[in-house]
Design a protein with these regions (language model features):
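Primarily recognizes the serine-hydrolase "nucleophile elbow" in alpha/beta-hydrolase
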Residues: 1-58
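Short, solvent-exposed loop/turn and secondary-structure capping segments
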Residues: 11-15, 26, 51-56, 75-80, ...
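Hydrophobic/aromatic beta-strand patches that form the interior of the parallel beta-sheet core
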Residues: 41, 65-67, 98-100, 192, ...
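Active-site-adjacent alpha-helix of alpha/beta-hydrolase-fold enzymes
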Residues: 57-136
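Alpha/beta-hydrolase-fold serine-hydrolase catalytic core, especially in secreted/extracellular enzymes
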Residues: 103-108, 113-264, 270-275, 281, ...
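Extracellular ligand-binding interfaces
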Residues: 243-272, 276-389, 405-426
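Noncatalytic modules at the cell exterior or secretory-pathway interfaces
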Residues: 390-401
Length: 427
């Protein structure tokens, strides 16, 4: 099933209703569908315009692909991310879910009818259409991903799976744009998803313990859309302060997860195992402790319209020249052997990408913040750590550590940490 906008939400609801025996809002209405629905594609979908039995639409054991454009002036928040999170894999079959977030895509150009005017006439004249991809380019993204998704899910062609795991595999096939993708399959074994309780030292995996040191920010919280509405997804925010040269030795900031048991999909860690997590730049500023009151005063003045214009320009220039955040991943085996690699070795942290939907100077009252944190899935093969550190035995892995000793200070959002079978699983 494929749906666009409200049709994207409807496709997911149909996927749920297909397996129900009665209508959730009136049990007197019986269902007898049982179609062979194996895959759902949602293009810039809405979410929870209809809530079966007053609840968000649940979905399980089905393949799911969702698209969203960062310049969608109609569904301006990534509502499909909520359905993505709600989809669970509970049986023994192979399933996967994937999402693709494209910076210069709007709402309407994924089809040939709605076009580049997400508001319609006459108000559409104030939309920032200069930022958009050409309509054919935007539909090329859809053609490539949808055809590959159908080949994979309906024809069982596993050779297309890599493009859902990492958009860079087919970068030459896609229009010039910024892409962020997520991927999770039914081999994924979750260690931390931050949904289980309010204790920041416990993990989703029984017996696992979380610790942190020298962190300027460490909190578990609900992730928000640009509009401040809930994504219904708890994550952890981690921040570190100061220059990289100051973050060494006893001042080293890190976030650590220690496992008391082996959660590997195959029963034990191997060279083929992938360490998986989702991450995004939070775009949060860390004030120095003694400057917190001063910074708050500045924010208050800005809200009152009294900010110094020169200072504002300097801040905008600084924001524009920001380098992507950097960190390293350290794995520690049961015997204490360590293997540490930069995340850039696998994929850099995406820079903050801000959207301007209209030509008017203040659009925040309609759209909220210019930046909406969108998670990117990272896949780190344990084999790469083994290659760099021959003494490291992936089979004895017990500690995963996120180490913040590189680059500038900043705050990241982290979620869905775990392990998955290798990339050749379906090939």
């Amino acid at each position: 099933l494929i749906g666009h906008s409200r049709g994207g939400e409807a496709a997911a609801i149909a996927g749920n209703f297909n397996r129900l025996s009665r209508y959730p809002d009136d049990a007197g209405v019986t269902f007898d569908f049982d179609f062979s629905i194996k895959a759902i594609i949602a293009i810039a979908p809405s979410d929870q315009q209809y809530r079966p039995a007053g609840q968000p639409n649940p979905l399980e054991n089905i393949n799911y692909l969702v698209f969203q454009g960062a310049h969608d002036a109609d569904v301006s928040i990534f509502m499909g991310a909520r359905q993505y999170e709600r989809l669970k894999f509970t049986d023994n079959n192979y399933w996967f879910k994937a999402s693709l977030y494209t910076y210069r895509s709007n709402h309407g150009q994924f089809n040939t009818v709605w076009g580049d005017n997400d508001w319609g006439k006459p108000m559409g004249i104030i939309l920032n259409r200069k930022a958009l991809l050409d309509g054919e380019e935007q539909r090329t993204i859809g053609k490539v991903y949808i055809s590959a998704f159908l080949e994979t899910t309906l024809h069982g062609n596993g050779s297309y799976l890599p493009l859902f795991r990492d958009y860079r595999v087919i970068r030459d096939w896609l229009p010039d744009d910024i892409y962020i993708n997520r991927f999770e399959d039914s081999t994924f074994k979750r260690i931390c998803d931050f949904e289980e309780d309010v204790d920041v030292t416990t993990a989703t995996l029984a017996g696992a313990e979380i610790s942190g040191k020298n962190l300027a920010v460490w909190r578990e919280a609900d992730l928000k859309f640009r509009s401040s509405r809930t994504k219904e997804n708890n994550v952890v925010f981690l921040g570190w302060r100061g220059a990289a040269s100051e973050r060494q030795g006893d001042n080293l900031p890190y976030y650590s997860i220690e496992m008391s048991e082996n959660p590997s999909p195959g029963g034990e860690f191997s060279h083929d195992t992938l360490l998986i997590f989702s991450l995004a730049d939070a775009d949060e500023k860390i004030p120095e402790p003694e400057e917190e009151e001063i910074e708050q005063d500045k924010r208050d003045k800005k809200k009152a319209g009294k900010a110094d214009k020169k200072e504002k320009k300097e801040e905008e220039k600084e924001e524009k020249n920001k380098k992507p955040l950097q960190l390293r991943i350290e794995l520690i085996s049961e015997d204490g052997t360590k293997a540490k690699l930069s995340l850039d070795r696998f994929m850099p942290v995406h820079p903050v990408i801000k959207s301007r939907f209209t030509k008017i100077s203040n659009e925040s009252s309609r759209y909220g913040k210019a930046y909406e944190p969108t998670m990117q899935t990272y896949e780190l093969p344990l084999a790469v750590f083994k290659e760099e550190y021959p003494a490291f035995d992936p089979g004895q892995l017990r500690v995963i550590r996120f180490v913040f000793d590189l680059g500038r200070e900043g705050v990241i959002i982290l979620d869905n940490i775990g392990f998955s079978a290798g990339r050749d699983f379906l090939r």
